[in-house]
């Protein structure tokens, strides 16, 4: 009967949907993280993480990525997302943005090499474009392997996540995102972005220096400005007590800013 046939087809479709997976790849010059998760409930099915003490060449990262993907069962992957986390990015207000000038925007704060290609993410909430270096060898490989995928810069989703949670009051909040690769410092006044930058760091003293540098550069008074530490809880806890000795109005936010929580 057609009813039975229809029911069987629906069951097959539901079963197929339940088995569908999404693959998230996060790449920086020090990290390679792969997450395989269920497309329905975002439950992590498999993951692999590598951290390198020193920055490595992007060709080496591509080789590592190829090897890591061999360890995953990619049969039911229906969505692939690449997240690039590097310092090679700059925010350009929409009124000044021209697609053809992306590399020109970057050359003022990034060391470019021959054959570098640029891409951009539009952040609607901030009316700005996040311009960054896209690793051409990585994107070309993923096109060959998966056919299609989406990609964006880590700071794009980080800014979107923070902006979504902000209220309309005019309080100044400094977000200090500490991850193993870099230190992101972002300043909002209400829902207006005042500052965003990424720094290299090796010690808790470096973190303190850059936070105080941003406070001074933006003419903020540290005993009136709220500072929130975000990122991986284990890393934050390693630095919180030290920072608290010098900056009193500081607090730890939850781990909702981890890559697996802000990429859908």
Predicted region positions:
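Hydrophobic/aromatic-enriched cytosolic interaction surfaces used to assemble or bind macromolecules
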Residues: 1-264
């Amino acid at each position: 009967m057609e009813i039975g046939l229809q029911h069987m087809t629906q069951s097959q479709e539901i079963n197929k949907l339940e088995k569908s997976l999404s693959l998230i790849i996060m790449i920086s010059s020090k990290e390679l993280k792969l997450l395989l998760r269920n497309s329905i409930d975002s439950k992590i099915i498999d993951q692999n993480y590598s951290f390198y003490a020193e920055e490595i060449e992007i060709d080496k990262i591509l080789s590592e990525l190829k090897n890591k993907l061999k360890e995953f069962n990619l049969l039911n992957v229906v969505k692939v997302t690449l997240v690039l986390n590097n310092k090679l990015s700059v925010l350009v207000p929409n009124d000044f943005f021209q697609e053809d000038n992306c590399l020109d925007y970057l050359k003022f704060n990034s060391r470019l090499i021959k054959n570098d290609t640029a891409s951009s993410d539009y952040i609607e909430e901030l009316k700005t474009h996040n311009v960054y270096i896209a690793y051409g060898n990585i994107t070309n490989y993923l096109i060959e392997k998966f056919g299609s995928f989406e990609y964006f810069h880590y700071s794009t989703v980080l800014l979107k996540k923070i902006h979504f949670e902000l209220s309309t009051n005019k309080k100044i909040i400094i977000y200090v995102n500490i991850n193993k690769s870099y230190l992101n410092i972002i300043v909002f006044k209400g829902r207006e972005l005042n500052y965003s930058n990424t720094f290299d760091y090796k010690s808790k003293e470096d973190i303190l220096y850059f936070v105080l540098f941003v406070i001074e550069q933006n003419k903020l008074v540290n005993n009136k400005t709220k500072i929130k530490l975000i990122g991986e809880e284990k890393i934050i806890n390693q630095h919180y007590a030290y920072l608290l000795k010098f900056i009193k109005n500081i607090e730890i936010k939850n781990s909702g800013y981890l890559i697996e929580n802000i990429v859908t």
